[in-house]
Regions:
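Short, glycine-/small- and polar/acidic-enriched structural segments
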Residues: 29-170, 175-178, 194-197, 216
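Solvent-exposed, acidic/flexible segments
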Residues: 51, 60, 82, 97, ...
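Solvent-exposed, polar/charged alpha-helical surfaces in well-ordered, non-transmembrane soluble domains
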Residues: 59, 65, 69, 87, ...
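Pocket-lining segment of extracytoplasmic ligand-binding domains
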Residues: 102, 177, 183-273, 278
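Phosphate-coordinating loops and pocket residues in cytosolic domains that bind phosphorylated ligands
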Residues: 145, 208, 341
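Secondary-structure end/capping motifs
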Residues: 239-326
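Conserved C-terminal helix/tail region of periplasmic/extracytoplasmic solute-binding proteins
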Residues: 312-350
Length: 350
């Protein structure tokens, strides 16, 4: 009988441990009870975070457990490819989402009911147009008649189209293919494409047999700035504003770690993405991470009383997408001013 009681106790402990750890993992789908209140705390039982495989502050925050620590509730991280994450947000399958500024501008212009609450990074050398060795592509003008791949409605797509425009080349002059990053690399290996505008980790693989034609850093110098940003469902934010503020605190904590202990941040990203620390450092240095204080500067969010340039930048992106017929009607600046909300960053700094 004693043995049976001991075995029962061990099983009970194991069950408790399983229940503890299944609430904080990376999933492929949203938790069904995502927007239910925890009757004891008034918090959602589970927060669904839409993420992507990127070497950024969110990856650090996830790997370090900053979200669980700040939010005080279960966190379910769902990994997406670039185009799918916006659709998941539209379907209310996730509460938070990381996506490019072009995708955010497209979604907001088309009525996606979200608030933009954080800039993950200003994109630079982390996104580049790469031409395959032997393709005879040495400049943007050499893309005429070539097959070029990138995921549509993303920052790379936007940068590519702007690069073509600045060089007097029509989209019709090239064969432009809509591919997610894993498909880009597969097509590259098969010899199906001549060039691709890509981000990490696919970018590093392309550069093994290719060369950079232009980077998003080069495009930024020409006035074409692209970002990765965080959005939240407006309904969720209205119901749980304190959770959104704490979410910002977790992200800022990751940025501070990167600034104060780069080695630890790099090690964390390398392990999370299953790449070497050298690769992680190179990828992370390809973009600029902003602290919460920096995000409130006029060049970005600005403040609640005086909005900064971010809304205007999104409007410019949307205007270009409208010209490309990706958006049915031209959006007003006020549409983006209403979506850009610096108050959560302001509250996180109090």
């Amino acid at each position: 009988m004693k043995l049976k009681r001991m075995l029962a106790a061990v099983v009970a402990v194991l069950l408790v441990l399983v229940m503890m750890f299944t609430g904080c993992g990376i999933s492929k789908r949203p938790a069904e009870n995502a927007d239910k209140d925890n009757s004891q705390s008034g918090k959602p039982e589970i927060v669904n975070i839409g993420s992507q495989q990127m070497p950024d502050d969110e990856k650090v925050a996830i790997a370090k457990g900053f979200f669980e620590g700040e939010l005080g509730t279960k966190v379910n991280v769902i990994e997406f490819q670039a185009g799918d994450i916006r659709n998941a947000m539209i379907a209310n399958n996730i509460d938070f989402a990381l996506l490019g500024s072009s995708s955010a501008a497209l979604g907001i212009a088309n009525g996606m009911d979200v608030e933009l609450i954080w800039i993950h990074e200003i994109l630079g050398d982390a996104e580049r147009l790469v031409a395959k060795n032997g393709s005879n592509i040495n400049s943007i003008k050499d893309l005429k008649g070539k097959k070029v791949a990138t995921p549509f409605a993303t920052t790379t797509h936007y940068s590519l189209l702007k690069a073509l425009e600045l060089n007097g080349i029509s989209e019709r002059d090239i064969t432009l293919l809509d591919m997610q990053m894993p498909d880009v690399y597969a097509a590259w290996q098969r010899g199906d494409i001549d060039a691709a505008y890509a981000w990490e980790p696919t970018l590093s693989n392309l550069l093994k047999n290719g060369k950079t034609i232009i980077s998003s850093k080069d495009m930024a110098a020409k006035g074409v700035v692209t970002l990765n940003v965080e959005i939240v469902r407006r309904e969720f934010a209205k119901k749980y504003p304190d959770i959104v503020t704490k979410y910002i605190k977790a992200l800022n904590k990751a940025v501070v770690l990167y600034n104060q202990n780069q080695i630890e941040a790099v090690r964390t990203v390398a392990k999370a993405l299953n790449i070497t620390e050298e690769e992680a450092l190179k990828q992370m240095k390809g973009s600029i991470w902003l602290t919460a204080e920096q995000q409130l500067e006029p060049a970005y969010f600005g403040t609640s009383s005086k909005k900064g340039n971010l809304a205007g930048s999104l409007k410019d992106t949307a205007d270009f997408l409208y010209k490309q017929k990706s958006i049915v009607s031209k959006p007003k600046l006020s549409t983006f001013e209403q979506a850009v909300n610096p108050s959560y960053i302001e509250n996180a700094l109090k």
